[in-house]
């Protein structure tokens, strides 16, 4: 059985969350653990992946966007999306060498974990041909955008629990114009974020065949093997 660590946080500014990811990345790179799953919410932020640009898929003036939320260009795949309170963001920092060096399989498994989670709440979700993420009909409930370096993953998924969906109205989320977004709340499911996080950990353990130990931020200090 693979062994990993899970870190559950509250509402975190985007750049602070990125720094936490980088610390986790270094720990996984040193093979101190097979993977680290970071769970949090972000303060309102729009992020643009490597396929997007500032002039694409933003439906209002940039200055107005920046009044509503932070805006960053980031390393993950995909185009623009929104993160904010009421959304479970999961950053799996996994060494794919411990599984299979197959990015498509990794994304498939991320989707599978969310699909299984939503099924427990009576939400029938699935995949959509030609698109990533998890969908309920023609509306996306969970976005996926990852980056991989040295077969270690970072960035991740964003599941809309009770997110303010009006933020998505200012953009073409993920560059998609013909379909919309939804949330668990919009689908009639009222649930606490912490409960969703706990159940998502369970689904990650099932799908990725890994056992997590819960840690806090102090455990992300990377051991210098030269001094150990």
Curated annotation (Swiss-Prot):
Q: Where is the BPL/LPL catalytic domain?
A: 31-212
Q: Which domain of life is it from?
A: Bacteria
Named from the GO MF annotations, one term is: lipoyl(octanoyl) transferase activity
A biological-process GO annotation:
protein modification process
**The encoding gene:** lipB
Among PROSITE patterns, the record links this protein to: BPL_LPL_CATALYTIC, LIPB
Query: Which function does this protein serve?
Result: Catalyzes the transfer of endogenously produced octanoic acid from octanoyl-acyl-carrier-protein onto the lipoyl domains of lipoate-dependent enzymes. Lipoyl-ACP can also act as a substrate although octanoyl-ACP is likely to be the physiological substrate.
Q: Which InterPro entries match?
A: aa-tRNA-synth_II/BPL/LPL, BPL_LPL_catalytic, Octanoyltransferase, Octanoyltransferase_CS
Name used for this protein in its record: Octanoyltransferase
UniProt enzyme class: transferase
Specify one Pfam family: LplA-B_cat
Q: Which reaction does it catalyse?
A: octanoyl-[ACP] + L-lysyl-[protein] = N(6)-octanoyl-L-lysyl-[protein] + holo-[ACP] + H(+)
Alphabetical keyword list: Acyltransferase, Cytoplasm, Transferase
What pathway does the UniProt record associate with this protein?
Protein modification; protein lipoylation via endogenous pathway; protein N(6)-(lipoyl)lysine from octanoyl-[acyl-carrier-protein]: step 1/2
The main location is cytoplasm
Pinpoint the site Lowers pKa of active site Cys: 140
Q: What else is known?
A: In the reaction, the free carboxyl group of octanoic acid is attached via an amide linkage to the epsilon-amino group of a specific lysine residue of lipoyl domains of lipoate-dependent enzymes.
Q: Quote the subcellular location field of this record.
A: Cytoplasm
Question: What is the taxonomic lineage of the source species?
Answer: Bacteria, Bacillati, Bacillota, Clostridia, Thermoanaerobacterales
- Give the organism, scientific name: Caldanaerobacter subterraneus subsp. tengcongensis (strain DSM 15242 / JCM 11007 / NBRC 100824 / MB4) (Thermoanaerobacter tengcongensis)
State the similarity comment.
Belongs to the LipB family.
Q: Which GO terms describe its cellular component?
A: cytoplasm
